[in-house]
């Protein structure tokens, strides 16, 4: 950047950034003190506009395709220079932050933003270290220029906006995008590429720890309950979305939370509710005339969000780290109403369901998605963020589970008694009771019933849960129709899994079509 031509605010405080955002017309204050900002037409991630620079140091390690689209190194150089020139006379906000709450596995990153509220988001979601880059690692750079308009013909992009990762130069370019989630997910993708080479499993999961130091992980796509279920008043939060699992422990990749706000209530989600206050960024949340947020209003998007630092949560693990997990929960949102609320998995079944990543897009975080809920298979419960081939992550998961002896569970936070539109969704208290049973160890060696088509072991009793709910066939009025839907789901699993080169033990661990 050309210093002297523009005003640069370096490592600004929360109060300064809120003040700048209000003065510059970037947002408004709510009655609870949070800052509301609107992102315009792009109210979610833009996967079609995300690229990775194809260069010799990383190209052999990346699974190229529609998720990881290749970008020309020369075109990147030109576009980066044009964005720098565009920002040269603009007021800018810059912070030196870190990604990864681990002394060995952190990445230092300098974040430069055109908007004050984007900088506040970055400082909420990334880690503000006591001492920046104590191991003197090469520093990553993020530039976020939301008002820069890309020209596909000139810039080599797919539209007027883009996200580009460059592993060789340690650069992330965001241009033409106001949705702040792109910043956090771009650095998550960076860590998802770097960590496996160090023997660390990067995970799209939340994590918490009990009073006795027992760690639980919750894997799942957006909207399946990662943030809600890990924000447990009886446990201490490590983080809500991105973690690394190294030999000896897990660590948060972030320093904050990015919670979905749609239908947020104080009763069901008190931890998140209380975290929304001064310093929090609310994205696309609608307010009433008294500036009170209306979390039921989805007129701008289903994907309304709250971004706040972990310090806003009273019951948190202050070092953002935990021991290796005794329990690992795969959260799936089953729109067919076929899966049980909880199943106990073998390690082969864990690998099968981790690779499958069966769930639904709920209030999708991607632009272009309607509010319609549809089933999907998202490898590793986060396909859009993993640059390496899926097998790399599955092998690391198997290794970690085996070496520590973690027990894996499949928990359905979706529908029962019929598909979406006919059946009803499991309520949060029911799922919380199941999670309580998991973390207490109650389900470790219990009596189970085997569901043949789904090839799943289901406990016959769970404290605090109606036993009729545990075997899904009991909740369907038409048992023959249930069998038909179960068969359809088993076929969908088998068809999706055909692409994976795995052992017979893993392949045979799935549903039986």
Curated annotation (Swiss-Prot):
It is found in: Cytoplasm. Mn(2+) binds at residues 185, 204, 241. Substrate binds at residues 45, 179, 185, 305. Pathway: Carbohydrate biosynthesis; gluconeogenesis. GO terms for molecular function: ATP binding; metal ion binding; phosphoenolpyruvate carboxykinase (ATP) activity. Its EC number is 4.1.1.49. Keywords: ATP-binding, Cytoplasm, Decarboxylase, Gluconeogenesis, Lyase, Manganese, Metal-binding, Nucleotide-binding. Its cofactor is Mn(2+). The keyword Nucleotide-binding applies. SUPFAM superfamilies: PEP carboxykinase N-terminal domain, PEP carboxykinase-like. InterPro entries: PEP_carboxykinase_ATP, PEP_carboxykinase_C, PEP_carboxykinase_N, PEPCK_ATP_CS. PANTHER family: PHOSPHOENOLPYRUVATE CARBOXYKINASE (ATP), PHOSPHOENOLPYRUVATE CARBOXYKINASE ATP. HAMAP family: PEPCK_ATP. Involved in the gluconeogenesis. Catalyzes the conversion of oxaloacetate (OAA) to phosphoenolpyruvate (PEP) through direct phosphoryl transfer between the nucleoside triphosphate and OAA. NCBIfam families: pckA, PRK09344.1-2, PRK09344.1-3, PRK09344.1-5. This is Phosphoenolpyruvate carboxykinase (ATP). The gene is pckA.
């Amino acid at each position: 950047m050309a210093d002297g031509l523009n005003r640069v605010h370096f490592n600004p405080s929360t109060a300064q950034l809120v003040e700048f955002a209000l003065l510059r017309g970037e947002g408004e204050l709510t009655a609870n003190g949070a800052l509301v900002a609107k992102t315009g037409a792009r109210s979610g991630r833009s996967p079609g506009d995300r690229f990775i620079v194809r260069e010799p140091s990383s190209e052999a390690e990346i699974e190229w395709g529609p998720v990881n689209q290749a970008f020309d190194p020369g075109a990147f150089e030109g576009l980066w220079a044009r964005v720098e020139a565009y920002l040269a006379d603009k007021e800018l906000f810059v912070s030196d932050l870190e990604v990864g709450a681990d002394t060995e596995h952190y990445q230092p990153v300098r974040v430069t933003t055109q908007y004050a509220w984007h900088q506040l988001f970055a400082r909420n979601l990334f880690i503000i270290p006591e001492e920046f880059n104590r191991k003197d690692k090469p520093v990553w750079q993020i530039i976020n220029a939301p008002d820069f308009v890309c020209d596909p013909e000139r810039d080599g992009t797919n539209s007027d906006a883009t996200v580009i990762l460059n592993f060789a130069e340690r650069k992330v370019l965001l241009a033409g995008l106001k949705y702040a989630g792109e910043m956090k997910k771009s650095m998550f993708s960076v860590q998802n590429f770097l960590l496996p080479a160090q023997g660390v499993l990067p995970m799209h999961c939340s994590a918490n720890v009990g009073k006795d130091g027992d760690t639980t992980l919750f894997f799942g796509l957006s909207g399946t309950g990662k943030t809600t279920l890990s924000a447990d008043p009886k446990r201490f939060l490590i983080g809500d979305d991105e973690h690394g699992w190294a030999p000896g422990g897990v660590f948060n990749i972030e320093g904050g939370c990015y919670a979905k706000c749609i239908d947020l209530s104080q009763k069901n989600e008190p931890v998140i509710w209380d975290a929304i206050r001064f310093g929090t960024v609310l994205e696309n949340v609608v307010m009433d005339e008294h500036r009170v947020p209306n979390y039921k209003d989805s007129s701008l998007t289903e994907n309304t969000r709250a971004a706040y630092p972990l310090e806003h949560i009273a019951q948190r693990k202050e070092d953002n780290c935990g021991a290796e997990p005794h329990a690992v929960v795969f959260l799936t949102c089953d729109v067919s109403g076929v899966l049980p609320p909880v199943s106990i998995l073998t390690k082969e079944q864990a690998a099968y369901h981790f690779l499958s990543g069966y769930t639904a897009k709920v209030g999708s975080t991607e632009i272009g998605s309607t509010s319609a809920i549809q089933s999907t298979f998202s490898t590793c419960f986060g396909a859009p963020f993993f640059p390496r081939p899926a097998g790399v992550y599955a092998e690391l998961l198997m290794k970690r589970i085996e070496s520590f002896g973690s027990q894996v569970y499949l928990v359905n936070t979706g529908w029962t008694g019929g598909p979406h539109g006919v059946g009803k969704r499991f309520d949060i208290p029911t799922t919380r009771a199941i999670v309580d049973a998991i973390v207490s160890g109650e389900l470790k060696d219990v009596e189970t019933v085997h569901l043949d088509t789904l090839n799943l072991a289901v406990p016959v009793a769970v404290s605090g849960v109606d036993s009729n709910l545990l075997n899904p066939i009991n909740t369907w009025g038409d048992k023959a129709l249930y069998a038909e839907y179960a068969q359809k789901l088993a076929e969908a699993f088998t068809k999706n899994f055909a692409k994976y080169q795995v052992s017979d033990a893993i392949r045979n661990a799935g549903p039986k079509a």
